[in-house]
């Protein structure tokens, strides 16, 4: 119910960012160098960037340096934390596609704004109260490190991955059920603790796989690779439908 309410509240920005993010993600550097056409979808890379620039014009809140909940909202109505991670990822993709410094600058500004709004103190329940919300950011920040080699992104990403995987000890004020997202007994990743560790959905398992692989690329630490394989195996057996794909 909680997740559904959040989705409804942010549906405009989320739906558009999913579409635009998928378009940007599908534009690899090598493809962009070969031509300016994205294939049989009927749009060019130039169209994608035009759409992205319009997205930023209407939804990026300059004074707070974060994204609005929707185009009609003022400075007090900003998109929730996990959707900000999606927008952060889009900026990385825009920079990789174009090499335009303005997107690198936007990424830095957005990071600063989100640092002010959400703190990136992963143990602060007032900002971070669901595992998947954190893991979306973990993967995005790992990608930012791979792009910039700026250690600030890697540290926050690694700290976030550790926190999600291991939980917050009760001795440090942790919730009794905040034992970490990973289930060492049955496998898979829980998306929550505050609602009673009620589900192991795609929204936490697959972002965990992606984040672990990005961190493996960033650090060459085989523990991330093994964690990615472990979660992928569980997700393939429990979440993937081989009939429908």
Q: Language-model segments: which ranges?
A:
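Glycan-recognition and catalytic cores of secretory/periplasmic carbohydrate-active enzymes
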Residues: 29-245
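Bacterial N-terminal signal peptides that target proteins for export
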Residues: 4-16
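C-terminal motif of bacterial Sec signal peptides marking the signal peptidase cleavage site
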Residues: 23-26
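Sec-dependent N-terminal signal peptides of Gram-positive bacterial secreted proteins and lipoproteins
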Residues: 19-21
């Amino acid at each position: 119910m909680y997740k559904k309410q959040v989705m409804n509240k942010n549906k405009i920005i989320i739906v558009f960012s999913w579409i635009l993010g998928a378009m940007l993600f599908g534009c690899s550097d090598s493809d962009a160098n070969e031509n300016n056409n994205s294939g049989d979808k009927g749009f060019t890379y130039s169209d994608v960037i035009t759409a992205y620039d319009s997205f930023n014009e209407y939804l990026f809140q300059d004074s707070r340096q974060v994204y609005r909940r929707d185009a009609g909202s003022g400075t007090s109505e900003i998109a929730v934390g996990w959707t900000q991670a999606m927008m952060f990822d889009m900026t990385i993709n825009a920079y990789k596609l174009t090499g335009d410094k303005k997107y690198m600058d936007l990424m830095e500004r957005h990071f600063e704004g989100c640092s002010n709004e959400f703190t990136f103190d992963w143990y602060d329940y007032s900002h971070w109260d669901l595992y998947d919300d954190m893991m979306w950011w973990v993967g995005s920040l790992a990608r930012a490190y791979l792009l910039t080699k700026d250690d600030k992104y890697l540290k926050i990403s690694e700290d976030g991955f550790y926190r999600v995987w291991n939980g917050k000890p009760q001795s440090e004020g942790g919730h009794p059920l905040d034992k970490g997202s990973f289930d060492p007994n049955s496998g898979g990743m829980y998306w929550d603790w505050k609602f009673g560790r009620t589900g192991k959905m795609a929204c936490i398992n697959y972002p965990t796989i992606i984040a672990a692989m990005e961190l493996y690329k960033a650090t060459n630490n085989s523990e991330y690779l093994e964690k990615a394989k472990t979660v992928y195996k569980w997700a393939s057996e429990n979440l993937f439908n081989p009939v429908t794909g």
